[in-house]
Amino acid sequence: MLSIVSPTFMVSCGNHGAGDPSTIPFVRDILSDTTSTVYEKIRKSCIDGRDGSIAIVGPSEQTLFLADNFMTCDDFDNVNGRCIPDGLPDFAGETFDLICDSANAPYEGYLKQGNDVFLKELTVKNFLSSIDTVFHASQFDKNTTERKSASKIVILSSSYLSAFGYHDIMSIVNAARPDIAVISPVHSMFRYAIQHHPEANGSFAVWTDEQTLGSGIYATAWSEMVKEYKTLKYEAYCPQHGKSLRDRIISFFRMYKSIGNTHKIGAVLVDDMPLKADVLNEELARMRENNDDSLTFYSGLLTDRFEFIDPATAIASECISFMRKENCFTHRVAYPSTRIYCTVPVTGMAAQDYSPQGGFTEDFKYNRADCSDFETFMLVEKPTRFLDENLKQFLRKNAQNIYNEYVSD
């Protein structure tokens, strides 16, 4: 490994024994020295929140998909904040800094290798990059940096980060800078459901895929949230892919009923990108209007105000609520804008650590040691090769606004 320490991440890891013992060593060491450069950056970051950006951090697909939703989101009245569309983008005038973690994703590999501590650490490091005001000018120039905005809100785009990093970030934020908003998709969906569906008495269902469910993400988030919301409980199911929306909805309700559930569901949290809650809600409304026989069999399981909720819906609501509370809207008369940054491998490491495509080999990526003085990735502005064909196809199909801005001629 090459000996490189980014100024953003410069922490000397030792056994100081400070802070929350449930956090990772990297975080405990940040909290143990309140005079350190890193701690000071956190404490002083984005003092004037109005000028700050909204960062979205995580794997490229999830990050760009969320950003695309926020570009045209119109769920609120921009004057009084009521949940009524007003024909104006909810995030008018705001800038989204998209930190696509190309170097380190996908994240499930860390869990397969039993290296969840490193996943938590890189989540914290990406958070630090989002609130910092510098990024590297080039992957091939480790010394030259350029300026960017610090972020007033940091959104984690992947559910994996809800379980592997969010708690550690919040340990830092609560100690050093409580007025920075950090939003986790899983925590945000649960909060939204609790706030908007009190009739459910904290009982909800989760629609996700087998890999996400098997990772323990929801069990981890629930164990944290139940301390605050004592009645919170959930059941998770994985409807089959490849069927029509109607069939998938019926499949979900069938799974819920098949284990003997009789209590009504107030909301279903949908964590199965690129599936959107509004599409499911529209299909469910059509089924009701058409008196669908299959739905009639399960309608007794749904409260009168039942709805599907996805990360984009819940996160947008939490962002708007925070900005109204802190009075940190930019008040610029403009459409929302985006800037894309990416994590990339540093140069100069052993040749066998790089894949033919220029990233890390899987063996190297998923077996890196936590709390090391050797930094292996850096943040740069969107490089030329960032959008490969697979990502372009994903954007063309699922994130048309981002596609038009960065891909379409």
Feature locations, PLM:
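Non-catalytic structural scaffold of enzyme domains
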Residues: 13-409
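Bacterial N-terminal signal peptides
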Residues: 1-8
